[in-house]
């Protein structure tokens, strides 16, 4: 009897096709942004080096700061996803990413750049696990496999977007406005 109630509850959480597509696109857009902000500092390293007088170790710390923020949230993330659900968790986390992007664009020192990168890392740390948790709850088995693989592809596209497109936009916009644009992109995924 108890297992039937559990199965009934799981089946009642399944989404219809249209809602599934909307949910996937929202999560995929967030994961795209996550991968983009993860890799963008490598593309911007010459400009950041020039503007802040950074050395190779500083660039390494900027990259590491992102991963430190990301890693710091991983243990509690699983509990929060189970307790509050993927939607609520990713929205809270993405708010941190928006703040981090804005702080990065306004940074005046290496320390403020590093703090902003840690905040961004924390903010996007749920961008893969929240969707995978949601898909497991809301999609049937065949849709789950497709959604998971498409999510990983979306992340790869985000990494690609951090290279040539960013290099093309740099002379037009500069790196600070690009982080404002990233903040707006992340806000848009939250909508």
Regions flagged by a language model, labelled:
Residues 2-30, 34-35:
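Cytosolic juxtamembrane N-terminal segment immediately preceding the first transmembrane helix
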Residues 22-54:
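Extracytoplasmic
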Residues 39, 67-75, 159-160:
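Residue-level signature of mid-helix packing/kink "hotspots" within the transmembrane helices
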Residues 72-108:
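Conserved MFS/SLC helix-loop-helix module at the cytosolic interface between two early adjacent transmembrane helices
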Residues 100, 111-119:
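Paired small-residue
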Residues 116-154:
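Cytoplasmic helix-loop-helix junction between adjacent transmembrane helices
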Residues 151-191:
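Helix-loop-helix hairpin linking two adjacent transmembrane segments in secondary transporters
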């Amino acid at each position: 009897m108890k297992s039937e109630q559990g199965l009934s509850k799981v089946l009642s959480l399944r989404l219809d096709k249209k809602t599934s597509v909307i949910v996937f696109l929202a999560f995929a857009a967030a994961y795209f942004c996550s991968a983009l902000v993860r890799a963008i500092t490598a593309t911007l390293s010459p400009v950041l080096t020039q503007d802040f007088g950074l050395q190779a170790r500083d660039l390494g710390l900027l990259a590491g700061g992102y991963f430190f923020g990301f890693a710091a949230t991983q243990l509690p993330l699983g509990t929060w996803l189970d307790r509050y659900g993927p939607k609520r968790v990713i929205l809270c986390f993405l708010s941190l990413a928006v703040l981090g992007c804005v702080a990065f664009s306004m940074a005046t020192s290496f320390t403020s750049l590093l703090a902003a990168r840690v905040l961004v890392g924390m903010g996007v740390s749920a961008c893969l696990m929240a969707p995978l948790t949601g898909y497991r709850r809301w999609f049937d088995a065949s849709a789950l496999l497709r959604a998971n693989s498409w999510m990983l592809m979306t992340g790869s596209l985000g990494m690609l977007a951090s290279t040539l497109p960013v290099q093309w936009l740099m002379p037009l916009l500069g790196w600070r406005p690009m982080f404002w644009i990233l903040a707006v992109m992340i806000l848009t995924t939250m909508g």
